């Protein structure tokens, strides 16, 4: 049997993962990661509940993880990757927001922390054969597949992992649904069986987003402009606080119909909006993605490809039009609110074959220049 280090987060998914591996006869070691220090990282604005908020919620997770490890009778250790997370995840997040993009921190968090530094630690310190995580996804010989639970499938967040990382990773929940995981945890009497799923920024948690960003990026107000009429409709507090397709939070009142964010001009600090009746401004039919991660050698010969542009979106049919160096172009039927900075993940059936960061959007052959 293999020696496997499980990333035990304090949540139910990783707890059941550890149980299943031990039940299968493996030598299981639990390790809790702490990757964020609110005091050290100047994280004071944006607390979800000003009265009851604990400045370091991961401490409760650590306590839960210790109890679970005791219940499962497996050893547990704790490791900090606070500097690595700041340097290799959070700094990139801030830079992208300053550039007018909408990044997804979970992508880099998985690539650089959970499946890089954690894997290195597990191999060097514990001589692990594999690491395991509580993700709803599947691996097989370095290939990545969607999890059986379509509502919880997390393969989208894993699209930037290398084949070598995937070859050393096990996802025990890949063939299970969340309801089955909860049932197992309840039957075992695990203390976190009913614990709610984690939300918010990877390893940071829930925050009032606008306030949280102001810890690191000063507000830069500007005009809100109707993209069709060019009329100034109001003022915004900063482009970085808004994303394409957003319809609330920019303070427009007294309008005949709802308005959506459709783009921006970063240099002029302009936030472009459009009424609901003019949704064409949200549409694109092709894109260019950079930072390509090729997870299949045969993708050029595959038909019936589909793509996701955000988590929990139903995959839509696409065609790969061009590949050049580390970038690729795809086309699709007109689709709304695809957002630069987010990840596009391409599937053949349920296998992830290619992923990249959305860089440019096009409609009818023309670049959408109101996203600059």
Swiss-Prot record:
Disulfide bonds join 109-202. It is an enzyme of class 2 (transferase). One of its GO terms (cellular component) is cytoplasm. One of its GO terms (biological process) is tRNA wobble position uridine thiolation. CDD domains: MnmA_TRMU-like. GO terms for molecular function: ATP binding; tRNA binding; tRNA-uridine 2-sulfurtransferase activity. SUPFAM superfamilies: Adenine nucleotide alpha hydrolases-like. HAMAP family: tRNA_thiouridyl_MnmA. This is tRNA-specific 2-thiouridylase MnmA. It comes from Mesomycoplasma hyopneumoniae (strain J / ATCC 25934 / NCTC 10110) (Mycoplasma hyopneumoniae). The lineage of its organism: Bacteria, Bacillati, Mycoplasmatota, Mycoplasmoidales, Metamycoplasmataceae.
């Amino acid at each position: 049997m293999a020696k496997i280090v499980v990333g035990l987060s304090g949540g139910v998914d990783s707890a059941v993962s550890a149980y299943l591996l031990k039940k299968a006869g493996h030598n299981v070691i639990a390790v809790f990661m702490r990757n964020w220090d609110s005091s050290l990282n100047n994280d004071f604005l944006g607390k979800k509940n000003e009265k009851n908020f604990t400045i370091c919620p991961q401490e409760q997770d650590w306590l839960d993880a210790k109890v679970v490890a005791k219940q499962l009778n497996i050893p547990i250790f704790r490791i900090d990757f606070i500097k690595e997370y700041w340097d290799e995840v959070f700094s990139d997040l801030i830079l992208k927001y300053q550039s007018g993009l909408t990044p997804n921190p979970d992508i880099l968090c998985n690539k650089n922390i959970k499946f890089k530094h954690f894997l290195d630690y597990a191999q060097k310190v514990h001589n692990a054969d594999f690491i395991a995580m509580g993700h709803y996804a599947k691996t097989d010989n370095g290939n990545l597949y969607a999890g059986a639970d379509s509502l919880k499938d997390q393969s989208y967040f894993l699209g930037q992992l290398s084949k070598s990382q995937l070859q050393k990773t096990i996802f025990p929940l890949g063939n299970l649904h969340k309801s089955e995981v909860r049932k197992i945890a309840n039957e075992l009497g695990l203390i976190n069986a009913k614990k709610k799923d984690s939300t918010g920024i990877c390893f940071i948690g829930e925050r009032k987003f606008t306030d949280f960003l102001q810890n690191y990026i000063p507000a830069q107000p500007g005009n809100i402009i109707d993209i069709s009429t060019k009329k100034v409709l109001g003022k915004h507090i900063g482009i970085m606080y808004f994303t394409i397709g957003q319809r609330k939070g920019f303070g427009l009142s007294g309008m005949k119909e709802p308005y959506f964010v459709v783009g921006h001009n970063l240099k002029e600090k302009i936030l472009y909006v459009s009424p609901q009746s003019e949704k064409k401004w949200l549409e694109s039919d092709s894109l260019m993605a950079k930072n390509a991660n090729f997870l299949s050698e045969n993708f050029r010969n595959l038909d019936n490809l589909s793509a996701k542009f955000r988590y929990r979106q139903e995959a839509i049919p696409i065609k790969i039009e061009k590949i050049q160096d580390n970038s690729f172009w795809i086309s699709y039927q007109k689709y709304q609110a695809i957002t630069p900075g987010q990840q596009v993940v391409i599937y053949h059936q349920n296998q992830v074959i290619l992923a990249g960061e959305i860089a440019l959007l096009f409609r009818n052959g023309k670049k959408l220049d109101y996203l600059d």
